[in-house]
């Protein structure tokens, strides 16, 4: 028996809005504890992890582990047809994931499961010394400010602030955020703005957002649901200063 019911489909929609812009195909693993996926883009630049606990769902029935191989673009087309006040139900039949959205009207879609030889990438274990809480709205606006002058951005952290900075051909930009954390060391790295914008498509997943960074190390963005019922995280490889 497989049946998942969620009264807030926006959690799925915002997750896969970001995920579908990063990877073409995913394998969603579901068992009695919850739903999870781990994926990396073809260029091995961005890694994504999604985990939704069993307790998040209104109804959660999964009597044996199941793997759902899906085309993310096709899944996102369907999720876009949901409304925030719909109730979403996930079931399966032979070769299909069935999504039902019920509100003022009832909509049912079947998304074909695909054949996928998939080696689930293991989640990188990076020993960060710096983890900074930052409202995702502030991060998004900072990136919008920076991208008018450059296609890459440097993140720099010291004991007082997080600084986002870019130097362009015709203009420069610097955004400073007082993080209020106890930071004992400095860190700096450069990242592609286009990749950060893909990650920030998930901004509505949660307001509980953190950044981890190290010098010339990947940037990790964490979005956590309340009560630890869900986590969406992205790990972005840095750009080297000498890269064109």
From Swiss-Prot:
Alphabetized PROSITE patterns for the sequence: PCNA_1
Molecular function GO labels: DNA binding; DNA polymerase processivity factor activity
Record GO biological process: leading strand elongation; regulation of DNA replication
InterPro entries: DNA_clamp_sf, Pr_cel_nuc_antig, Pr_cel_nuc_antig_CS, Pr_cel_nuc_antig_N
Pfam entry (one): PCNA_N
Database matches in CDD domains: PCNA (cd00577)
Annotated Gene3D superfamilies: 3.70.10.10
The organism's place on the tree of life at top rank: Archaea
Record key words, sorted: DNA replication, DNA-binding
Oligomer status and interactors: Homotrimer. The subunits circularize to form a toroid; DNA passes through its center. Replication factor C (RFC) is required to load the toroid on the DNA.
Functional summary from the UniProt entry: Sliding clamp subunit that acts as a moving platform for DNA processing. Responsible for tethering the catalytic subunit of DNA polymerase and other proteins to DNA during high-speed replication.
Family to which the UniProt record says this protein belongs: Belongs to the PCNA family.
Descriptive protein name: DNA polymerase sliding clamp
The organism of origin for this protein: Methanosphaera stadtmanae (strain ATCC 43021 / DSM 3091 / JCM 11832 / MCB-3)
